[in-house]
Amino acid sequence: GTSEASKLGILVAMIFFPYESLILKMIVASIFAMGGTFLFLGIIRKIKSKDNVLVPLIGIMISGIVSSLTMFFAYKGDMIQNLSAWLFGDFSGVIKGNYELLYLTIPLVIVAFLYSKKFTISGLGEEFATNLGLNYKQVVNIGLGLVCIISSLIIITIGAIPFLGLIIPNIVSMFNGDNLSKNIYLSGISGSAFLLLCDILGRVIIYPYEIQIGLVSGVIGSGIFLILILRRLKLEY
């Protein structure tokens, strides 16, 4: 629900701060993204089962609820047209004067690399990480902050790209384990290749017209996600 909460934050910024800069919209989107992420984590903590299939499904359900709220308020405020640029990812807006915000992700990615081993340990669970001397809550909060800010920057610049952050890291982990120090750059390269494929398909399917990359990645990503779920269920049963 992080990206959907970011879009809700963008809508709120457009309603209350219509003439302000993209920086302010990014800040509001980051705050909402963090709120959506904490909501997701709060629900997960109350559920006893931590099944690998159940957790992402809960995230998808939360995304659906937040997305519905966003569309409802956008419709009531007659802002569907204004919000459409952020509903689905589109590289057409990556032009001079718009994409410079993406440079802010560089130091954030460096911080993610520096904390990658700590993130790996925290993924083993709070009790195990604490026994190893890790400040679990601090590391988790840093990770959440990085995810929320980076997600907001990308959505403000390009728009939402469905399933990218869900399927690519999971596929990389399937083949390479859970070592984030290796998986971060592998996920980046794999995600870039996936986006390039979706962009090419979006440009050639109905040439000379173009399909938004968010629509293409949504169709392909949902299919891959179903395959991953069915594969997991087959291995378990």
Q: What are these model-derived regions, one by one?
A:
Residues 1-237:
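Alpha-helical transmembrane segments in inner-membrane proteins
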